Amino acid sequence: MNQEFSTTVSTTLVTQPLTVLSEEESLFAASVREFAEAEIKPYVREMDEAQKLRPEILAKCFELGLMGIEPGEEYGGSGGTFFMACLAIEELARVDPAVSVCVDVNNTLVINAFVNYASAGLRERYLPRLCQETIGAYCLSEAGSGSDAFALQTRAEDLGAHYRLNGRKMWITNGNEAGIFIVFANLDPAKGYKGITAFVVEKGFPGFSVGKKEDKLGIRASSTTELLFDDCLVPKENVLGEVGKGYKIAIETLNEGRIGIGAQMLGLAQGAFESALSYTKERKQFGQAIADFQGVQFQLADMAVKVEAARLMVYNAARLKDARQPFIKEAAMAKL
C-alpha cells in the first residue's frame, strides 16, 4: 500500500506546555513569592511554636487579593483563574504551609462553593466579606464520618423561619480564624444522603461555638478544631444551594479542593528540595561540599524529578478545571 505523508508540521497543533506560565501568571506567582519571602518567612518558626497565625499576615493576604482570587471585582475579588489560585497556594506553601492551607480552604472550598451554588442574595451578602475581610471554613468531617463523609450525624430541623442545627464537627481547618462556615447537616435522615443540606453559619449565631483545637505534629499554626452546634439557629435563607442537595455540593467542591491540596504539597516539596539543595552546597565532608558526591547527586535528582512530576499533575488538573474539561480523575491523582 502506497501512502503519501506530509512532512509539514502544523504549528496549530502545538499547545502551551503545562508548566510555562503566561506573563500575567508569571508576574502573579513572582509577587506571591516575594510576599511570602519578605513577610511570612521571618515568622514561620514563631507561628508554628505559638500554634497561631499572625493576624497581620492574614490581613495582608486579604489586602493583596489572595483570599478571593477567582471572584470578580463586583464581589471584591481579584478576577483571576483557578490555576492562579493554585499558583498562590503553591508559592505560599513553599515558605509556610500553614498560611497556604488557610488561603487554600478559603479559595478552593468555601468561595468556590458560594460561586457555584449560592443564591444571588447569599453571594452578594457573603462573597465580598470572604474576599476582603472574613475567613471561611468548610465543615463536613465528623468523628464517625471521615472517609464515609455522608454518615454524618449533625442534624437540622425546619422550624419555619429558621433551621435548628445540633451536632459536632471535627478537624475543621480555619476553625479559630473563620467567621463564615459552610456546614453540612442532615435535614431528613430517613432519606440518607439525599437529606444532607449545606447551611451558611456565622460565628455569632446563637447556639454555635468553636471547641477544642487539635495539638498537631505539623502545620501547627493552622487551626484544626471541633465545632459545636447546640440548638444553633440558622436563617431560612442561609441554605446553600437546594435543600437535600448538600451531598452534590460536598462531592463537587471537594473535587476542586483536591487540586488545592496538591498545590499545597507541591509547594511544600519545592521548599524542602530547595532547602536540601542549599544544605548540600554548604555541608562539607572530606574537604568538599557533599553536593559534589555522586551518591548525594542521585538523591537530589530523584527529588527534583518527583517534584516536577507532581507539578505536571497539579498544573494539568488546574488547567483542565479552568477549561471546563473533566478533571475529577486528574484532581485525585494530583492530591496523591
Give names to the regions the model predicted:
Residues F150, H162, N166-V210:
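A short core secondary-structure module
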Residues G144-S147, W171-N174, D188-A190, K216-S223:
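Short Gly/Pro-enriched turn/cap motifs at secondary-structure boundaries
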Residues A151-Q153, P206-P235:
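Flexible, small-/acidic-enriched active-site or ligand-binding loops
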Residues M1-V105, Y117-L122, E133, G146-A149, ...:
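Alpha-helical interface subdomain recognition
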